[in-house]
Amino acid sequence: MASTTVAQLAGELNRSASALLEQLQAAGVQKATPEDVITESDKTRLLDYLKRAHGSAEDGARKKITITKRETSEIRQADATGKTRTVQVEVKKKRVLVKRDEPNAALAESEASEAAPVVDAEEVARREEEHRRQAELLARQEAELKARQEAMEREEAERRARQEAAEAEQKRQAELAAKKAEEEAVAARAAAEASDEAPRRKAEEDAARLATEREAAQKAADEARVAADKIKAEEDAARKRREAAEAEARAIREMMSAPARVLKTPAERKAEEVKKAEQSGTLHKPVKPAGEARPAAAKKPAAPAPAAAPAPGSPAGDKKGGRGKSGWQDDNRGGKRGGLKTRGDTGGGADGWRSGSKGGRNRHGDDNRNAFQAPTEPVVREVHVPETISVADLAHKMSVKAAEVIKQMMKLGQMVTINQVLDQETAMIVVEEMGHQAVAAKLDDPEAMLVGDVQEQTNAEAETRPPVVTVMGHVDHGKTSLLDYIRRAKVAAGEAGGITQHIGAYHVETDRGVITFLDTPGHEAFTAMRARGAKATDIVILVVAADDGVMPQTKEAIAHAKAAGVPIVVAITKVDKPEANPDRVKQELVAESVIPEEYGGDVPFVPVSAKTGEGIDSLLENVLLQAEVLELKAPVNAPAKGLVVEAQLDKGKGPIATVLVQSGTLKRGDVVLAGTAYGRVRAMLDENGKPAKDAGPSIPVEIQGLSEVPGAGEEVLVLPDERKAREIALFRQGKFRDVKLARQQAAKLENMLEQMSEGDVKSLPLIIKADVQGSQEALVHSLKKLSTDEVRVQIVHAAVGGITESDVNLATASKAVIIGFNTRADAGARKLAENHGIDIRYYNIIYDAVDEVKAAMSGMLSPEKREETTGLVEVRQVFHVPKVGAVAGCMVLDGFVKRNSLVRVLRANVVIFSGELDSLKRFKDDVKEVKQGFECGLSIKNFNDVQEGDQLEVYEITEVARTL
């Protein structure tokens, strides 16, 4: 370990060596000179001595004593009633005694006797905190000051170093030149001494050369001096610039704080100078502006006189400040009289602020007053009218006021406001009426940006892709069972009621290749689903049951396939049944223009059985053969393009869409656009629910991450960035909304009479929530078909997803019934529906929903009134009773007659009166009913012309409930 001397320790402690030696001797450490070595034990003894000397040993002693004194006093105080009461007041006083050091004890006692403050612990802590803050502030200020001083010293040192370096370089150059000259002189003398016979001319040349070199050395020294002066000049210039910048900032601050000055034009300045010249030699004293201070005027010198006096007869200038050709210029602060405010052009020239096209009669500035002006023609503008435009925008395009457009619309018989939206046809009529040329505008369509993406897909290299096969046919003909056998899975058992209510998309890997199947519903309500399936498919498998034959949905499937232009492969199912008749099926299909190959047509017919598997291989072989003929190809290494087969809203996952990729490759993370929905693919699942990273052509996948539920059948495109997708989606939403709004406004007047005639029509409001969009479309379509002239179905709202509280609130406002198709209401919605008495009905089979709605509509129909003859009565004798009228004595020939029954009077088998019985008696007693074979007396209300031989037909009207 390195030894430490007394001098080194004194240097570390910033003390003198002699003082440290004295302290060491006082501590009992014998050291005589600063060079003596100090050990660690010596340092420890010195430290103990210093602690004892400065009182640190007494730190543990108690230095502060707190004394609390309690004083009680009484005061007398009057209360609200005027009585005087004695109130005891207790005051607590706290004193803190602090034990100080001995030298300061007397001073502390004197201060305590003078002030005797009461200081508590909080006050002490606050004061200590304040002292600490002040110390930190002082330390921070000292550090900043020290840093500035160090920076200035460093800058000065650098400047001195540069100057010294320049001087050293100059000196070195001079010394080098002198040394070289001296060496050459010595060499010359040595050469002269060595050879005395050298010519004198050589010596003179050497001398001249030495002189030249001496001059060069002097020149180098001068250049070094000039460089040093240049550095110094640059430093001076930098200092001056800094001072100038500071002065400018100071001037700007003074200017900002100074009162504002009035800027005047040259015309005003000339007028004031003329007035000043007129007042010279008089006793008039110029009035100083109100806002100007005397010191400011004294400091600022007056402006110089103008270079030339104004011409004779020239105007004095506009006192109010004209807007002349020259810009504003700063005026001095000399006191000048302000101009009088006058009416008219005081300047008389063209620069006055009141000068215009209709100047005064003494005005001479307008040289073109009598010049020829060509007549103005109406400007015919070419107005580009978009699909929808507001009245204000249309007026702006024609450069007219909106009021003019509104007047023109009123002339055309339509009341509009400035913000009302007009459709394209109406707007073009208005433009033509106002004398302009209307052109249907081509919108700044963001969808035009999609052309490049589609072109990129078209230019990509195409590869062979699997065929997309759609299975179509009538309900219960075995489509799903056939596909189930091919897939080796149980799908039909999972569908409610054993019927397919969704489009199922699957791809199957067979020994002969990959095939993608689309299973479509066969029920008549799912027409839109079958149309979408035919649109996305390459080949259609038409399933016809051998025991049932061609049915309505079979014909519809044939029509869809022909409209899509895709080949058909007929699969005759259920051939294993005893009552199967494939030949009858062929004959019926021939009637529908589906000709089998054995009859000379081009449609293969394959008898199959989904139970035994008979004909399945032959069916797949025919499908792949058709695919080879079609030569199906699609680009793979390109942005994906596809079709939304089905879409739904999941409570946890959000909008979900089943997409069939038609070309390109869809990857997780791609930005997709589907109609008015857009988003980034967050997750992608195959038909088995397993995650998939990508999907090539003809592969169906389920994607998540869209902004909303897309419409089934929408085209799906992959775009390079989300901004473009959002822009196109919002454009589509706005376009559809504007067009719909404009059409609704145009159709209001046309529908008014129709709505008035429908005032007596009853309506059944419904809110429909389904699991997928295809089912929702089918259910809405089926229910709307139930509407009649008397009762119609009103679909208030139809959407995908569970039943929420907002649906219940909507049902409460519209008095609607909520139908949930494969969906359920959450707890909040159920409670709210129960409180408001809203009927929520759940279904999972479309037949049941349609039947119950049909029954409800039947109950809303007004009952049918039917007449039923109950009896026939013959008049045998007529009695005329005073105050009663004619009374007929009758015999009941058939049926019975009741009191107050409806009757028709028949005379010669012709109805002459229809009315109601007034009374019915047997003998003298009133009776309720008289049956066949008995006599009775009766009178008819408001009819006295009863004759013998008349017949009375008794009937009653019954109401019968009607059904749809």
Swiss-Prot record:
Q: Where is this region: G4?
A: 573-576
Locate the compositionally biased regions of type Basic and acidic residues: 123-133, 146-183, 197-253, 266-278
Name the source organism.
Ralstonia pickettii (strain 12J)
**Which protein are we looking at?**
Translation initiation factor IF-2
Q: Give the GO cellular component terms, alphabetically.
A: cytosol
Q: Which residues fall in a compositionally biased region of kind Pro residues? A: 303-313
| Key words of the record | Cytoplasm, GTP-binding, Initiation factor, Nucleotide-binding, Protein biosynthesis
Q: Where is this region: Disordered?
A: 105-133, 146-378
Task: Please name the gene that encodes this protein.
Answer: infB
